[in-house]
Structures are given as structure tokens and as C-alpha cells.
């Protein structure tokens, strides 16, 4: 039977040949695990995803949540799927044994989650949002807040959301208008409107805990005046039982292009002046707290984009193998049988492009998860700091590159299916629609590019960038052991050298106050930087593939040769094109910056 969620062989390659998941078991936190426990968790995830999540993916798309009597109504299949996820323990996959968790490395929890993201992005989002909200309370909440709200979330009784966006303030959070007035009992009364709140209402849990950004009456202007509040759908009594309904109203549902099975809500807080909220942490520190959840979410968005691209790639690959159509160009006999379309060179190009984008992104997402483990479990503080600096630098790439290029992979999957791909009878058009959200939410491409070029590169004296350059150089040096990899290594080394020169120039211009011109083409910089990182990850995979071929396992020869061909494609077809964009960046080209609105 063909695999539809992801390639189990490729996952094993990443975990055990590229990223050394077993090496993590040498660390104290993961010492009770081994490859058997890792594989058991992955097997359970695959089984639940196939049995409970994948079967209603299309139905959830065709039957959006409905707004009835102030509530959101979902199709009945969502609840059993989410319950199966909870019962298997995946909500607390990374949490410690003492807290009732599986104490898995983040690398392994992300490997497990990938199956759910591929099977059904919409239904998966409900527990995923809850994990992020719970982590936020765990990091910054009081002991009372943890007992009242966090523990029921860990138990799967309460779910969570992230409530940031307002009708007039999307990316520009400094302009939010939701207000929080202090009450005599130490709580706050919130008033305002939030939109596009995923999971803002549903019947899947006893309660919903909204993490809400708002401003206090004495708040400073801008982002330094934003505070964070816990606002439950139902108030919680001191004994843990549910109290009365809080003054949070579901005002309506948005009807989306994709991701239709997830409620996208408009929420009104405090229409009756009785919306109770609880301040999290210090006043005016809300955005810095929320960024923890947002950074986690951005990595999750990147992996979600990967898995939708992966699902489309696998489906179009199977289709191309089974669909007979036409004959190869040198076939002169019209009586010969049509060949499977995978025999046509242009179809191979589209499949190879998908493979390069999807498997390159998959490697990067899991590498980021491995880095997250390093930030918490490496032996020394200096090592943990290094890992954090690198992860911080790579986060905009982990979020944005798969969101752009795995969406392109979905487009190619549709093209391979031809007319069938354009119909709703085949799943690839839904994968595209679902994936189109990922370049938008949790920080658009433009926001990510400004974050990378305007902030992350120079952070801590450029420590993250210097570390990345050293890692790429190390990979290139190890690649020299294989003559066949010279043609792959050299384009990457040329790109890295050119990127360093252009980056230094841009950072110098920024330091000299040329802010607008230096950042005007930041989206191009994001793309080139991303191609550099993905090129590095493909060269690393190519080295591991060569090592695998050297071991001589006949059953894996085709797998490893496929890896080498995809690496060759990306490093010799995609990477060289970045030099044109670097020239535009170096020149501080102003064609976009100086375009006037009346000229359009």
C-alpha cells in the first residue's frame, strides 16, 4: 500500500541518519527513551492520523463550521479524532513524566505531529493551539493561574487560543484598541473585538482559555504598552468547577478559502461590561510573552506547510505512476501503448521540484526541532545559548520558506494531475487552498523578512549568523570526501560567499541610517537566505546518502540515489539563480521603494 501522509523511510533517514535522534537518549532528560520507544510513538501517531483524522479531511472542507444560536457547530467526526489524540498522550508529548507527559524530545514530538498535519490540518489545529496557550501560562502565569487554567488544559478538558488580531490591527499590534480596566478584586474587565481567532469557539472541550492582548489605562504608546490576559469562556470556581459564562461573545464565523474545518471566529469581549480577565506576568510585557507562543507557532506553521506540500507530492507521485498518457518523444509507432506520465521528462521535473522543496523543508523543520531540544538539554549554558541564537536566526526561514515553496509544490501537484487536479474530486486542490494560509498567518512573508534582515542578523553581534556560516563550511568540508558532491558543494560555497558580502553591506547601510532603502527589498533577502539554508540542508542529506550507499544495503539504493538527485537538482538548478537577487539587494535597487501610489 502506498504511503499517503509521509514517507516512513524518509522520516527514519532524517531521525536516525541525519539528525541523530538516538544521540538525544544520552542526555538525562531523554535517558529512558530509545529507538524502540521513538518508533512506537511514531507508529501510534501514524495509526491515529490514518484512522481518525484523514477520513474526514474532505468532509470538514465541504461542511464548514456553522454559526447557530451563538455557538460554532462542527461535523461530528472532529470530536472522536481530537479525543483519540488526547487519549494517546500527544497533547503532552514533550511534557515530563512527572506531569503526566511522554517526555519525548521535541524532535520526536514534531515527527509524530507531522502525521496529523498531513492527514487533516484543520482538525489538528485545535489541540495544537491548546499546547501553545498552555506553554504560555506555564512559562509566565502565577501558581494560582496554573492550577485554575493550566492543569485542565494539560488534562485536555480546557482548550486554548491566541487572540491578537483586531479589525483595524493585524500585523501592526501596536495599534490594538482592546482595553483592560482593573477591578477591585485584582482581576480586570476587558472590552474590545478580536477577529480571525482560530478555535475561538467549538464544542470540543469544557472550556476555552483565550490568551488576549490588551492595553491598560496607563499603558505607554506602541508595543511597549501591551499586556497579556487569560480570558476564559467560562469562569472557573475556586474548586475547579465551571462557573458562569464569561462576557465573551461569538460574533460570527469567517468563511475561508481553505483550512475550513477550523473555526475562524470574531469575538466580542465585554459587550456587557463583565468580561473577566487575569493579568499574566507584568503589565506592559504582553507582547514579549506572546512572542514565545508565536515563535513556537511559527515553527509549527512551517511544519504544517511542509506536510501539506508532502501530501500533495505523494498523491501526485502515485497518480503519475498510474496515469497512462502519451508516448515518449522518440517513440515513432502510434500503435505502442501509452506510457505512465511519470516517464515524461517535464513530469519528472515537476515531481523532482516537489521532492526538493518538500524534503528540504522537512529536514529543516526537524532540524529546528532538534535545535529546540539543544536549547534546553545541552550540557552547558554556553552551548544552550548557542543553540538558542541559531534557532532564533532560523525561525523566520523555518516559517516562511516552506510556506512559500511547499505551496509551489502543491501548485505543481495540481499541474501533474491536469484537469483532474483542478476538480474537487481529487484532494490536491484542497491541499493548495489549505496551504495558502501559511504565508499569511503568524507573521506574513514581509514581516518575517523585516524580522530577519532588520533584527535577527545583527542580534548578539551576529552570533547566530556566524554560527550558521561555520556549520555550512563544516558541511562543505565533509562533502569533499565524495568527489561526486563537488558539483553540489561548489554552488553552495559561491552563494554563501556572495551572501556574506551583500549581508555585510546591508547591515552597514542600516547602521548608517539607510533604513528604508536597506529594508525595501527584504523579501528578496529572505528568499536568498532561505535558499542558502535549504541548500546547506540538502548538501548534508547528500553526504548521508553517500554514506548510506557506501554501506551497500541493496534495498536502500534507490532511496539514496533519489536523495542525491534531489540535492543535485536544488543545488545546481535553484541555488545559482539567487545571484541575480543578490545583485538587486547589493545595489539597493529602488524600483519598488520609489513606486508612487498614483502610478498604479
Where are these regions (language model features)?
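Amphipathic, small/basic residue-rich leader segments at the start of a protein or domain
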Residues: 1-124, 148, 373, 583-584, ...
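Alpha-helix capping/hinge segments and adjacent helical runs
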Residues: 2-5, 10, 182, 259, ...
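C-terminal amphipathic alpha-helical interaction region
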Residues: 99, 459, 475-600
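Internal maturation/activation junctions in enzymes
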Residues: 126-130, 141-183, 193, 369-388, ...
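A structural-propensity feature for long, helix-poor, extended segments
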Residues: 133, 142-145, 149, 444, ...
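A short core secondary-structure module
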Residues: 187, 191-245
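A glycine-rich, basic-preceded beta-loop-alpha segment at the flavin cofactor/substrate interface
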Residues: 196, 235-251, 256, 266-297, ...
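C-terminal helix-coil-helix/basic helical segment that borders enzyme active sites and/or dimer interfaces
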Residues: 359-398, 504-520, 541-558
Amino acid at each position: 500500500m502506498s504511503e499517503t501522509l509521509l514517507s516512513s523511510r524518509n522520516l527514519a533517514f532524517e531521525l536516525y541518519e541525519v539528525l541523530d535522534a538516538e544521540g538525544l537518549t544520552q542526555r538525562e532528560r531523554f535517558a529512558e527513551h530509545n529507538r524502540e520507544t521513538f518508533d512506537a510513538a511514531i507508529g501510534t501517531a501514524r495509526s491515529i492520523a490514518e484512522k481518525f483524522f484523514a477520513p474526514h479531511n474532505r468532509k470538514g472542507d465541504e461542511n464548514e463550521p456553522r454559526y447557530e444560536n451563538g455557538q460554532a457547530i462542527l461535523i461530528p467526526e472532529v470530536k472522536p479524532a481530537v479525543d483519540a489524540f488526547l487519549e494517546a498522550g500527544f497533547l503532552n508529548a514533550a511534557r515530563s513524566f512527572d506531569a503526566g507527559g511522554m517526555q519525548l524530545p521535541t524532535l520526536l514530538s514534531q515527527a509524530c505531529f507531522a502525521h496529523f498535519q498531513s492527514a487533516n490540518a484543520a482538525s489538528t489545529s485545535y489541540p495544537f493551539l491548546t499546547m501553545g496557550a498552555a506553554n504560555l501560562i506555564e512559562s509566565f502565569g502565577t501558581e494560582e493561574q496554573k492550577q485554575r487554567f493550566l492543569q485542565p488544559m494539560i488534562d485536555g478538558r480546557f482548550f486554548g487560543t491566541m487572540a491578537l488580531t483586531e479589525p483595524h490591527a493585524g500585523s501592526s499590534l501596536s495599534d490594538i484598541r482592546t482595553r483592560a480596566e482593573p477591578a477591585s478584586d485584582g482581576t480586570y474587565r476587558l472590552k474590545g473585538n478580536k477577529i480571525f481567532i482560530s478555535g475561538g469557539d467549538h464544542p470540543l472541550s469544557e472550556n476555552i482559555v483565550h490568551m488576549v492582548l490588551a492595553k491598560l489605562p496607563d499603558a505607554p504608546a506602541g508595543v511597549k504598552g501591551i499586556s497579556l490576559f487569560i480570558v476564559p469562556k467560562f469562569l472557573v470556581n475556586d474548586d475547579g468547577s465551571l462557573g458562569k459564562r464569561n462576557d465573551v461573545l461569538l460574533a460570527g464565523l469567517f468563511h475561508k478559502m481553505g483550512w475550513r474545518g477550523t473555526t475562524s471566529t470574531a469575538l466580542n469581549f465585554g459587550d456587557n461590561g463583565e468580561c473577566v480577565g487575569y493579568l499574566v506576568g507584568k503589565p506592559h510585557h504582553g507582547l514579549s510573552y506572546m512572542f514565545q507562543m508565536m515563535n513556537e507557532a511559527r515553527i509549527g506553521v512551517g511544519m504544517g506547510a511542509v506536510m501539506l506540500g508532502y501530501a500533495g507530492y505523494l498523491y501526485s507521485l502515485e497518480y503519475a505512476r498510474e496515469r497512462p498518457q502519451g508516448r515518449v518523444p522518440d517513440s515513432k509507432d502510434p500503435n505502442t501503448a501509452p506510457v505512465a506520465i511519470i516517464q515524461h521528462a517535464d513530469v519528472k521535473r515537476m515531481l523532482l521540484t516537489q521532492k526538493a522543496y518538500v524534503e528540504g523543508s522537512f529536514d529543516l523543520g526537524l532540524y529546528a526541532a532538534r535545535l529546540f531540544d539543544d536549547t534546553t538539554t545541552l550540557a552547558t549554558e554556553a552551548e544552550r545559548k548557542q543553540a538558542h541564537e541559531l534557532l532564533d536566526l532560523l525561525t523566520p526561514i523555518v516559517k516562511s520558506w516552506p510556506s512559500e515553496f511547499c505551496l509551489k509544490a502543491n501548485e505543481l501537484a495540481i499541474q501533474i494531475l491536469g484537469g483532474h487536479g483542478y476538480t474537487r474530486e481529487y484532494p490536491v486542490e484542497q491541499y493548495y487552498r489549505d496551504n495558502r494560509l501559511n504565508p499569511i498567518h503568524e507573521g506574513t512573508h514581509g514581516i518575517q523578512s523585516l524580522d530577519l534582515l532588520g533584527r535577527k542578523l545583527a542580534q548578539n553581534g551576529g552570533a547566530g549568523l556566524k554560527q550558521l556560516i561555520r556549520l555550512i563550511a563544516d558541511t562543505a568540508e565533509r562533502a569533499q570526501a565524495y568527489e561526486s558532491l563537488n558539483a553540489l558543494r561548489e554552488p553552495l560555497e559561491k552563494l554563501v560567499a556572495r551572501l556574506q558580502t551583500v549581508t555585510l553591506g546591508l547591515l552597514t547601510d542600516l547602521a548608517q541610517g539607510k533604513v528604508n532603502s536597506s529594508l525595501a527589498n527584504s523579501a528578496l533577502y529572505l528568499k536568498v537566505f532561505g535558499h542558502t539554508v535549504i541548500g546547506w540542508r540538502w548538501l548534508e542529506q547528500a553526504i548521508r546518502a553517500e554514506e548510506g550507499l557506501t554501506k551497500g544495503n541493496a534495498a536502500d539504493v534507490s532511496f539514496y540515489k533519489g536523495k542525491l538527485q534531489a540535492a543535485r537538482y536544488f543545488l545546481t538548478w535553484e541555488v545559482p539563480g539567487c545571484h541575480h537577487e543578490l545583485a538587486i539587494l547589493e545595489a539597493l535597487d529602488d524600483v519598488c521603494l520609489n513606486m508612487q501610489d498614483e502610478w498604479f
